[in-house]
Amino acid sequence: MATLEAKVVIVTGSASGIGLATTKAALKEGARVLAVDISPRPSCLEDDPELDFFQCDLTSPSAAADITQRCLMVFGGINVLVNVAGIIDHCSSVDTLTDDIWERCMAVNLNAPVKLMREVLPIMKKQKSGSIVNISSKAGSSGAVSGVAYTASKHALQGVTKNVAWRFKADNIRCNAICPGGVTSAISSNIDSSAIDFAAVETMLPIIDSVKVNRPDFELVRAEDVANAIIFLASDKSSRISGAMLPIDDGWSTI
């Protein structure tokens, strides 16, 4: 039996990277998936009766409610929420940070997952089961990975994950976070290179390079590697795991 057989899964950020890999993996494991992204449906997501693609801006005030209602309308329930969608900053230190990038990072990386959890939790409580997987980052436990806005948003998301895990364990609802580090994805494609804080980047490069150089293939972590862990935490095979911060970073978390 497939690990997500008959489960209804919401995946945000599903048009590329980790979200796309997770959407494909969930379908392969028997799930019915509501795939959400601000971008249009990618051509590689073929027509599938178990898939519904919903184009949506997560920063819209009604986004969380709209996504939840769409999932209930199409699939009749919600078993799993996977909060993948995220943006990065320009590696800005606090002295070069703009209000816009701070507010944008918080809106997408923290506010959107929190609001979606708020919407789905009553449904999960009523059915006495559910699994939530949030995508944090190596930056959620370190100050030497990205800029201050991204770092703060991912630290905060880990705190939210732990709080939800503890508060709703009596309802048989689990909440965990994946903490990727050095993943090949499109998250950096929208960065304005002219706004990058290169002085900050210079302090981080030696650490990042050391992570890559001791891999036999010199490759970054693949989106599929992260998706495999997400599927495990979404499934009943991890029924006693809640409140975990799981690093997928080739050992980066050890330094």
From Swiss-Prot:
Uses, biotech or industry: Shearone derivatives produced by this cluster are interesting candidates for Alzheimer's disease (AD) therapy since they moderately inhibit aggregation of amyloid beta 42 (Abeta42).
Residues at the catalytic site: 136 (proton donor), 150 (proton acceptor), 154 (lowers pka of active site tyr)
Q: MF terms per GO, please? A: oxidoreductase activity
The record's listing under Pfam families reads:
adh_short (PF00106)
* Pathway terms, separated by semicolons: Secondary metabolite biosynthesis; terpenoid biosynthesis
Residue positions binding NADP(+): 11, 57, 118, 150, 154, 183
One GO biological process term:
secondary metabolite biosynthetic process
- EC numbers listed for it are 1.1.1.-
Q: Which EC class does it fall in?
A: oxidoreductase
Instruction: Establish whether keyword Oxidoreductase is in the entry.
Output: yes
Sorted alphabetically, the keyword list is: NADP, Oxidoreductase
Q: Which SUPFAM superfamilies match?
A: NAD(P)-binding Rossmann-fold domains (SSF51735)
Give the source's domain of life in one word. Answer: Eukaryota
State its role.
Answer: Short-chain dehydrogenase/reductase; part of the cluster that mediates the biosynthesis of shearones, diterpenoid pyrones (DPs) which are structurally diverse meroterpenoids consisting of a diterpene linked by a pyrone, and which may exhibit a range of bioactivities.
Which family would the database say this protein is a member of?
Belongs to the short-chain dehydrogenases/reductases (SDR) family.
Q: What is the name attached to this protein's record? A: Short-chain dehydrogenase/reductase esdpF
Organism, scientific name: Penicillium shearii
Which lineage is the organism of this entry classified under, starting from the top rank?
A: Eukaryota, Fungi, Dikarya, Ascomycota, Pezizomycotina
